[in-house]
Amino acid sequence: MTENGPDVVLVHATNNSPEDLKLLAETKTPVSLSPYTELRTGFGITPVGSFLRAGVPVSLSVDTTILCGNADMFAIMKAMSNIENGLQKSEFGISSQRVLEMATIDGACALGLADHIGSLTPGKRADLILVRTTDVNMLPFTIATNMIVQAAEPSNIEAVIVDGRFLKRDGKLTTIDMAQLARDTADTIERARKEASKEGAGKGINQLFTR
């Protein structure tokens, strides 16, 4: 822990003593919280408020789609917001603005890329998404930050622009052949099943997954 610092990112970090939090704050070590993974795997409840009150830099991440189901940062933001509100026993335990910052500029800071990405600022890369505010789940559209954190989902994204290049436009991906991707993933799964069947022949489930 004493070797941590701004060039190290701790992922999860759900179980920390007050001494741990103090050290993380003093060394300016950023923490990346992945609430869906932490809940699903039983790592524990993500104590974002404890980190923030201690002055620890906090960002949000998906971790891995194998554990969280999909790469849905809207769901991650909503989970983080609702978990903290539940812990604080208050609808206003953490603001949507603060959660959105953790999902954007704070993540860029954690990676040392805040001079290039993370906010819509002249001179930074043109990385942005366009969200439809007229879809039924976004109505009535009121406070933008609240709607993005509490109501938005991937299907509302009209466009994705990365470094000025459209990767999604008019609601459709521009650089990926989804039909081919579906075929490739199906082939990969089938090969994995065949290999697993060969390896597992004559073995019990415990033997197969114990090295």
Feature roles, as predicted:
Residues 13-14, 85, 134, 165:
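Flexible loop residues that form catalytic
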Residues 17-18, 42-45, 93, 117, ...:
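Structural motif corresponding to alpha-helix initiation and N-cap regions
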Residues 1-70:
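Active-site core of metal-dependent hydrolases
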Residues 11, 89, 171:
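Short, flexible active-site loop motifs that bind/organize anionic cofactors or intermediates
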Residues 43, 70-71, 142, 179:
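Short Asp/Glu-rich motifs
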Residues 104-211:
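Active-site microenvironment of metallo-dependent hydrolases
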Residues 2-4, 49-136, 150-153:
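His/Asp/Glu-enriched, well-ordered alpha-helical/loop segment
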